[in-house]
Regions:
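Short, structured beta-strand/loop micro-motifs enriched in basic residues and often containing a Trp
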Residues: 20-28
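Structural detector for short beta-strands of small beta-barrel domains
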Residues: 1-11
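Short, Lys/Arg- and Gly-enriched loop/turn segments at beta-strand edges
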Residues: 47-55
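Short aromatic-glycine-enriched beta-strand elements
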Residues: 14-18
Length: 55
């Protein structure tokens, strides 16, 4: 599985709304994301696992 990089655009309740570097929009439940995820965070989705990237 190819790694996919996302930027969190907004958080509404229990869901984060994000856009990949390829422009694909996605919505993910916050409990699945790493602690510290916030609007503007960069995330990596690889091997069915989320990683919060350093700023």
């Amino acid at each position: 599985m190819e790694p996919v990089y996302y930027t969190v655009d907004s958080i509404d309740g229990d869901y984060a709304y994000m856009t990949s570097d390829n422009g694909v929009e996605n919505q993910v439940a916050m409990f699945l994301l790493p602690d510290g995820t916030d609007v503007g965070s960069r995330l990596l989705w690889e091997n069915f696992e989320w990683t919060l990237l350093p700023e």
